């Protein structure tokens, strides 16, 4: 993925939902840059509108992005990596998870990778009211 981002200066961020987490894991290996991860995972590509790389059809939220910079962190040993910073040029939101200006997280059911083989899901949400402007 990183090689392709460097080469094209474009990328898509797809928010992974529980319904296709297994397919996502199937393509989360360090494949050579010429390997078609859609073919490996069984996911279907959907054409992007503003950039060349496709997005994941099943993704309920996708961001089409252009590259701003890549920041390398570490010395190349275990724990090192890169932070990719981009500009969102278009985002796609499934109408079924969007209501009155808000994304409905219970319908999106996003999954996040913590580290290694550990993942997390939103299951026990709670709300904390914060002040807009602190009192002095």
Question: Which residues does each predicted region cover?
Answer:
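Basic, polyanion-binding surface patches
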Residues: 1-136
């Amino acid at each position: 993925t990183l090689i392709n981002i460097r080469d094209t200066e474009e990328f898509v961020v797809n928010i992974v939902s529980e319904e296709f987490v297994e397919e996502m894991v199937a393509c989360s290996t360090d494949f050579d840059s010429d390997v078609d991860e859609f073919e490996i995972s069984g996911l279907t590509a959907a054409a992007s509108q503003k950039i060349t790389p496709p997005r994941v059809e099943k993704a309920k939220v996708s961001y089409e992005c252009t590259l701003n910079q890549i920041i390398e962190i570490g010395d190349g040993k275990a724990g090192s990596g890169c932070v990719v910073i981009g500009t969102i040029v278009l985002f796609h939101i499934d109408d079924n998870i969007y209501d009155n200006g808000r994304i409905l997280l219970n319908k999106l059911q996003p999954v996040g990778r913590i580290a290694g083989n550990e993942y997390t899901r939103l299951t026990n949400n709670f709300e904390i009211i914060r002040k807009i402007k602190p009192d002095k």
